[in-house]
Amino acid sequence: KVYMIIGGKDLLNGKRFDKGGYILTYDYDKWSFIDPKEAQKKLNLPRNPRDYTSIAVTTDDSNDEIVYASSMGDGVIQYKNGTPVQSYNEKNAFKETAGGYGSGYCYIDGLAFDKNGNLWMTSSEVNHAVLVLDKAGAWHRLDIEQLRGVYTINDILITSTNDKWIYVPRNRS
């Protein structure tokens, strides 16, 4: 399968294209999509998820397809076999929001799995810029002094030796 997400950041890594959080899937025969209204309705969200920035796909022990989509504003939405099953945000996972935007703005990017099946991600404009959802379902927040409050933190890349590299654009503080 091929996956594609809609939204994200502008060419200067600024926030908000303000596009609906669609996930498009091509299964080598046809395209299909998951409408963000489905996530809003099923997960009782205050708005449609929007501005997806990254996507990570895996399977669980039952061989169900699990998709995580991060967004610039709405945290992370988890899908199981194409159905939204969980929204991760400041209330149940991250414990903090991007400064200056009021309640509920979680700028998440750079989803990547490590060798142990833990899901790593970055979070902009917060004190704990690196977040980990471990394979058991527990959240961990890492405090890296140099990343506190940074305006835009992009991808986290995980190497074959399980090292983590974080991409932070220049001149963005």
Regions found by a protein language model. Give the residues of each.
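Carboxylate-rich, polar loop motifs that coordinate divalent cations or form catalytic acidic clusters
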Residues: 1-173
